[in-house]
């Protein structure tokens, strides 16, 4: 899908349609495919983009959270100055599976006192019940199966 311009545009525009008119100050995308979909969404919405990276990949002071994976745990980080308190945040990633990565990202946003508007995903694997880990936040997806 990424190598085909029409498919990629369709995915980004489809997510934008699902996100609708929600007021957003910043888009947060998780390493690495969250960057691919989050950055163009931020651009189209006229807001900033904040990357969430794995441990040790960001150059400045960070907030961090350890989160559970199917096979262990890992650490996510975000710059401490990534957003102002009260910023309206849209979290974007390609896939919602078990929900561990996005739950960790939600915790990072909370540490910086951001307000999560929604979590947007290209694909949701409903059988893995990742949505259950998201604390009732609004979730939008293009494809669910």
Residue ranges and their predicted role:
Residues 1-145:
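PRPP-associated nucleotide enzymes
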